[in-house]
A protein has these predicted regions:
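Charged interaction segments
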Residues: 27-28, 48-174
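A compositional/structural signature for long, glycine/proline-rich flexible linkers
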Residues: 32, 41-51
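Short, extreme N-terminal segment that most often corresponds to the first beta-strand
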Residues: 1-37
Length: 174
C-alpha cells in the first residue's frame, strides 16, 4: 500500500435524502450493515475477474463485492493519527453532519468519487449561489501539500489526483 492518500471531509447533508441513501451512507461510515440495494451507486465500479480464459466466450466472470469507503477505524498506518468517520443527526431534524478522516489507495478513487458526487448533490450548501465551500482535502501521505475538495453548484470538485486515477468516470448526473 505505497500509494496512500489522506482524505479529510466534512459535509452537512440535507434532511430530504431517502432512507435507502441514508442506509448506504451509514454502511459506508461503518454504522450499519450493507444494504441490499446501493442507490448512491457504490457498486457501479467493482472489479471483475475471469474464472477461466477471458478470451473464451463461455468464460464466467466474478464481480468483487462493493466495500464501504469510510469504515476504517483505529490508528492510521501512513498518515498518523486516527481514522474516523461519524454521521450524526443535526439539531432540529434539519439533516445530517458527516466528518471523515481515512486512508485511501488510488484503487478506491472510483468509489470515493461516487460518494463525493452524491454528497455534492445532497449537501446543504449544494446550490448556494455559486459560492465555493471548502469541505475537505486529499493529500498524498508523503506530501505536505493538500488538494482541496470544494463544493460549488452541487458538485464537490475533485483534485487532479482523483481525476487521473478515474479516467473512465461516467458522470451520470443522478
Amino acid at each position: 500500500m505505497g500509494d496512500v492518500y489522506e482524505l479529510v471531509l466534512s459535509a452537512d447533508i440535507r434532511a430530504d435524502v431517502t432512507d435507502d441513501e441514508l442506509a448506504e451512507l451509514r454502511w459506508h461510515v461503518g454504522e450499519g450493515p450493507r444494504p441490499e440495494w446501493l442507490p448512491i451507486g457504490s457498486d457501479r465500479y467493482v472489479e471483475t475477474y475471469p474464472l477461466g480464459d477471458p478470451d473464451d466466450p463461455d468464460c464466467e466472470w466474478e464481480n468483487a463485492e462493493a466495500e464501504p469507503v469510510f469504515a476504517q477505524r483505529g490508528a492510521a498506518r501512513r498518515v498518523g493519527g486516527a481514522l474516523v468517520a461519524e454521521l450524526v443527526a443535526r439539531e432540529r431534524s434539519d439533516g445530517w453532519a458527516l466528518t471523515v478522516r481515512q486512508e485511501l489507495h488510488p484503487d478506491d478513487f472510483y468509489r470515493l468519487r461516487t460518494l463525493l458526487d452524491w454528497l455534492g448533490r445532497c449537501s446543504v450548501d449544494a446550490h448556494a449561489g455559486g459560492a465555493g465551500f471548502f469541505v475537505g482535502y486529499l493529500r498524498f501521505h508523503e506530501s505536505v501539500e493538500i488538494a482541496p475538495l470544494v463544493l460549488s453548484n452541487g458538485r464537490i470538485h475533485v483534485p487532479e489526483d482523483i481525476e487521473t486515477h478515474t479516467p473512465y468516470w461516467e458522470d451520470t448526473g443522478l
